[in-house]
Amino acid sequence: MISRGEVRFNCCESTLMRIDEAHRLPGFDVNVMRIASNFGGGVAGWGSVCGAVSGAAMALGLVYGTSDDEAEREFSEKRKQMRTLTQELMNAFEEDWSHINCYGLLGCNTRTPEGRAKYDEMKAKGLLHCDEYVQWAERKALELMNIKQ
């Protein structure tokens, strides 16, 4: 994870920041970071889609996503390309890591006291792989964008 001073960014924020540092993302700004701040831990700590995957998907959206100024055909083509790339990202992550949800990746439900205790214990022992997920997601997103690393 990326840290700046005492601030430690979550998996989603860290993934977006790493991708933006490697290849400037169009439209990446404080508002994107505000959105990403709620996607760590599988969306607000809920255990859903891994924040690293969410961050990479957001980066793909910034590059290939739609806005309200395209003609219908261009809108549809962009949407199709973005979804194809994002699904490739998600399939590859699940293939490499066996799960795509934080709950499965961590092996515990951090929304329960028992799960939170297990998570804290694994974190203290350095058994979490979240930094690896962030690095993987950055590499895969750049690969999908055809950016040389």
What residue ranges belong to the model's regions?
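A broad structural signal for alpha-helix termini and local helix breaks/kinks
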Residues: 19, 23-26, 43, 64, ...
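Thiamine diphosphate
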Residues: 6-12
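Active-site nucleophile and cofactor-binding loops and adjacent substrate-binding regions
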Residues: 32, 47-52
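Amphipathic alpha-helical interface segments
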Residues: 12-22, 57-59, 74-149
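A short glycine/serine-rich beta->alpha loop
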Residues: 1-6, 39-48, 76, 122-126
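Short, hydrophobic/aliphatic alpha-helical segments
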Residues: 26-44
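Catalytic phosphate/nucleotide-handling subdomain of diverse soluble enzymes
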Residues: 51, 56, 60-66
